[in-house]
């Protein structure tokens, strides 16, 4: 299985993803949190998600969010929405981050729509910044601040616990 076709730097085999996950379980890399997305009914892995935490000062203040559902027949079934909600809870409720950044190809309409649905706001574009499939692509940068998350989630506020499987507590 080839995961994350749209992320050339993150295209990864299941075996490589599992190796990264084992590294995270051992606590070898606090800054990168990788998660395996499992289909609930079959418990089969269908993708990955990540939080790449910014540690530019002593206090972690933000992270890049990433996810990919590897198989087309699993797209548009609500997995992305569910995973992003869990990542938002992890980032803001557990890690107490101030902001999240979402990077995506400009032509990835599904990713842009999901980001905006989850409250992210477009902040910029890096023109022809990624070379993939023999051509350059623009990247769109979206951001979500803690107060925007709080305003969005407050009517739905749940106890601050995460259902994501991760290596460190």
Describe the residue ranges of each PLM region.
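Non-catalytic substrate-recognition and accessory regions of acyl/acetyltransferase enzymes
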Residues: 1, 30, 39-41
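A short hydrophobic/aromatic micro-motif that marks alpha-helical segments and, especially, helix-coil
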Residues: 12-13, 28, 153
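A generic secondary-structure signal
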Residues: 23-24, 90
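Acyl-donor (CoA/ACP) binding surface of acyl/acetyltransferases
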Residues: 34-169
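Conserved GNAT-fold acetyl-CoA-binding loop/helix
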Residues: 1-23
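Short loop/turn motifs at secondary-structure junctions and domain boundaries
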Residues: 25-31, 120
């Amino acid at each position: 299985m080839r995961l994350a076709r749209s992320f050339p730097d993150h295209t990864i085999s299941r075996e490589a993803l599992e190796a990264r996950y084992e590294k995270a379980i051992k606590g070898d890399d606090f800054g990168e949190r990788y998660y395996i997305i499992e289909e609930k009914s079959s418990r089969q892995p269908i993708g990955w998600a990540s939080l790449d935490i910014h540690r530019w000062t002593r206090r972690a203040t933000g992270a890049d969010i990433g996810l990919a559902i590897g198989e087309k027949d699993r797209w548009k079934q609500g997995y992305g929405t569910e995973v992003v909600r869990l990542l938002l809870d992890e980032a803001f409720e557990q890690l107490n981050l101030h902001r999240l950044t979402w990077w995506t190809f400009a032509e990835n309409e599904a990713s842009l729509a999901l980001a905006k649905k989850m409250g992210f706001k477009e902040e910029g574009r890096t023109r022809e910044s990624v070379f993939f499939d023999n051509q350059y692509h623009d990247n769109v940068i979206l951001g979500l601040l803690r107060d925007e998350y709080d305003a969005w989630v407050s009517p739905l506020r749940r106890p601050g616990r995460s259902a994501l499987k991760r290596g460190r507590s």
